[in-house]
Amino acid sequence: MPLPAGTTSEKYMNALDRVLDKLVKFKPEFLILSMGFDANIADPLAQFELKSEDFYEITKRTLKATNEFTNGKVISVLEGGYDLNALADSAFNHVNALVENN
C-alpha cells in the first residue's frame, strides 16, 4: 500500500484497515507477515511517523482479521530497522502480538 512520506499512525491504520478488508475477501489459508521496522519515527531512514506500539496494533489487527481463515498459521519475517532501540521496541511489540494470538 503506497503511502506518502510523513504518514501518521492514524493514516497508516486507516489504510491498513482497507487492505485488511480486501484480505478477508481473499480468505488466505496462511499468512506471511514481512515486518519492516524502518517505518518507526525514530529510525534515521523513516519517512513514516509510526511509533513502536503501532507495530503491535498492525500485527494484532492483521491476525484478528485473518485468524478465521488461517487457523493461526503465520510466518513472520523481520526486516529493516536501523535505530537499534526503535528496532528492539518495534520487534518486541510485534512478537507480543504474535504470542497473544496463540
Model-derived features: positions:
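A general "terminal functional-core" signal
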Residues: 1-102
